[in-house]
A protein has these predicted regions:
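Preference for bulky hydrophobic residues occupying beta-strand positions
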Residues: 15, 38, 46, 61, ...
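A short beta-strand-loop-beta hairpin characteristic of the jelly-roll/cupin
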Residues: 25, 29-30, 34-57
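Histidine-centered metal-chelating micro-motifs
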Residues: 22-23, 45, 52, 61, ...
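Ligand-binding loop in jelly-roll beta-barrel domains
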Residues: 8, 56, 65-91
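Short polar/acidic secondary-structure junctions
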Residues: 4-7, 53, 60
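A short glycine-rich, His/Asp/Glu-containing loop-to-beta-strand
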Residues: 1-27, 34, 84-85
């Protein structure tokens, strides 16, 4: 978690994904208006019900968090990404 835990307006998370890591077998949603996925290094594929979007280092994708989605890191490279979630879905001290 990059953003402060008590920040309710936005949540910023830096994630190191091992090669082949994924978000699980099923699509999921997040209770937020906007989700941004930015790839720092490696590659990741964002999956939606009707499409797949490959992303490489330097690429960003913005989408509604309530849209069913999933992701998978490149099998050889893995990925390092920044997730930005607006508003924050977790609030705590």
């Amino acid at each position: 978690l990059i953003s402060p835990r008590n920040e309710s307006r936005v949540q910023v998370i830096r994630t190191h994904m091992q090669p082949g890591a994924n978000g699980g077998d099923a699509f999921y949603t997040i209770s937020c208006e906007v989700e941004v996925l930015h790839v720092i290094s490696g590659a990741v594929t964002a999956r939606f019900v009707d499409r797949e979007i490959p992303l490489a280092a330097g690429d960003s994708l913005t989408f509604p968090g309530r849209e069913p989605h999933n992701w998978e890191a490149d099998a050889a490279l893995g990925a390092e990404v920044i997730w930005t979630i607006v508003p924050a879905t977790w609030r705590g001290e």
